[in-house]
Amino acid sequence: MNLNRHYLLPLLIAMLLIPAQDLSAKKKKQVKEPTDRELWAGVLYRMAEPVLSNMSEGKLQQNMLVELSPTWDGRNKKVTYMECFGRLMAGLAPWISLPDDDTVEGAQRKQLREWALKSYAQAVSPESPDYLLWRKEGQTLVDAAYIAESFIRGYDALWVPLDSVTKQRYITEFTQLRRVDPPYTNWLLFSATVESFLCKAGAPSDTYRIASALRKVEEWYVGDGWYSDGPDFAFDYYNSFVLHPMYIEPLEIMTNAGKNKVWNMPDCDYNRAVKRMQRFGIILERFISPEGTLPIFGRSITYRTGTLQPLALLAWSCLLYTSPSPRDKRQ
């Protein structure tokens, strides 16, 4: 009897623990997984917070660690800060321009927008430690174009609220970039983007720089949604990084302004350009493997997280094609 009791007690304890452990496992399984939107909103915030929280206080250049490639070409390393800020804001602008709401995401957007507005001011204030490298370097044209693109995409939320001094400083900095003579590549569109933003903002703009760039890119269309990056076609992702977005956006601005009649350029048609970008979007969609990866080809492959920019623009503009379905592209 004593022997039975000796074994019975551990058995009873074990029987009591098993359901408890099982219940604990069920509770763990019931932890709410983030939605796709919550996941990507979190990624956006983690990318943007270190840059904008520092730059809003004029501390980006002080605190940002810069690593140079072993094949670095010797250019001024301060171009890094403009590249960092400009490309971040070009991608971030549509999201943080959404109306405020009471969600966690809404609070994140509001905070980033507040930091961004302060950072824009720091970028053009000669007294700021984070005054960007606007002068001398030719590379500045590239990254300034992404800042201009952020203003195009978030005009009411990011440009309009800036004070008059900051706005005039941007107009001055953008205007002096005409000193850069862009090569006959996608660089023509950097000039066109800057000048079309000036037009949108009501500042003096160089219409020739816009029109000549758009005409040249139109000449470079090779078919099936692809543009050549200059006279010779290159199989890379620059149709995603530059050619489609920075062809569509200036063309839309100038078409809405009625400027295409002034240019007498019926060859540059906005609706046709959209159809080409839709076709390119289908190709991009079919590049994606079942594992969610993209094929690696062409130069600047480290930028490949930007390869889906045309798809993002189409979705944002409600211009997504019907096959594959919009839901597939969101997934």
Predicted segments — roles?
Residues 1-28:
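Bacterial Sec-dependent N-terminal signal peptides
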Residues 26-84, 94, 114-118:
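Low-complexity, Ser/Thr/Pro/Gly-enriched N-terminal "stalk/linker" regions
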Residues 81-82, 92-95, 109-277, 286-312:
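Aromatic-lined, polymer-binding surfaces characteristic
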Residues 313-317:
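Loop/turn-rich, solvent-exposed surfaces of beta-rich toroidal or solenoidal domains
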Residues 321-331:
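Single conserved hydrophobic/aromatic residue that forms the stacking wall/gate
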